Amino acid sequence: MRGIRFAILVLLIGFCGTAEVVGADAAADAWKALRAGGHTALMRHADAPGGFGDPPGFRVDDCATQRNLSEKGRADAAKIGARLKLEGIAFEQVLSSPWCRCIDTAMLLNLGTVETEVTFGNVVVLRDQREALTAGARARIAQWSGRGNLLVVTHGANVQALTGISPASGEIVVVKSGSDRAEPVGRLLLD
């Protein structure tokens, strides 16, 4: 029962958060930070219909058992990657949650070699590991010291746990690297 209440709460928060409009200032700040380099871009995977979480009995190592990207999600991911390239934004490293919808989003962005990172795994599904995963993600962001940017494709609940922002599908929240606070500096919702 407790798990169901938690899932409903996270779902409601997610719906509230996706109704937010990304303002021009937040987008301008995000572009400026990414052009300067040394930041982390936390991206929620592109559109993956079918509800919340994953179907019962899903396995991380079997995409057929998970929620996957829709055709719209696949097209959106490719468009977002093209837009980032057009704007001259590059990433030194691209990390992804091990969930297929995140890996597929990262690959369709076509912004570099994609490496899976378990600490960005879905904190809703792995709720018993939420604190450890979030702490690991904060540490990973804090460790980033590249002159370029780090891109992490993960889940909305993970971005929210790190930043307090519940992003829309495909939305990018840019945070300062080198700090374990994952402080947001801007947001991009590209179409």
Q: How should these model regions be labeled?
A:
Residues 38-40, 146-154:
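Generic beta-sheet signal
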Residues 25-115, 123-127, 135, 165-191:
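Active-site-proximal alpha-helix that buttresses catalytic centers in soluble enzyme cores
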Residues 143-148, 177-178:
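A short, structured loop/turn motif at beta-sheet edges
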Residues 1-5:
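Positively charged n-region of N-terminal signal peptides that target proteins for export
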Residues 7-17:
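Bacterial N-terminal signal peptides
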Residues 134-144:
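A short, acidic, amphipathic alpha-helical segment used as a generic capping/interface helix at domain edges
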Residues 18-23:
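Sec/Tat signal peptide C-region and signal peptidase I cleavage site
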